[in-house]
Amino acid sequence: MKITAIKDLVRKDVPIYYRRLFSGTLVIEMVNSTVESRIDFTVETSPMGQNEIIINSMEQVDYPLLPLNKEVKKFISLLDETGGLPG
C-alpha cells in the first residue's frame, strides 16, 4: 500500500487561525489496483509550533485502518512541510 496523491485538495475557511481544514480525494495504490477515497482532515498548530494532523472522516477502504491512518498522516505531514497544501 502506497499513498500517491491527494487530488482536488481544497482548504475550507475556519475562523480559528491555528486550525486549517482540508478536503480532497486520497489516491491509494494497492498491490493490484488503485483506490480513491474522500478525506477530510485538519492540521492544527499547537502553541509550541508543532503541527497535529487529525483525520476527521475518510471513506471506507479495504485495508487495515491503523496502518492506513499512519501513512496518511505521514503523507499529509510531508505535503505540509514541502508547501503542497493550499494556502
What positions do the PLM features span?
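Short beta-strand segments that buttress and anchor functional surface loops
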Residues: 24-29
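Compositionally biased, intrinsically disordered low-complexity regions enriched in proline and serine
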Residues: 18-19, 23, 64
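Acidic, low-complexity intrinsically disordered segments
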Residues: 10, 34-87
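Short, solvent-exposed beta-strand/turn "edge" segments of beta-rich domains on protein surfaces
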Residues: 11-19, 30-32
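A short, amphipathic edge element
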Residues: 1-10
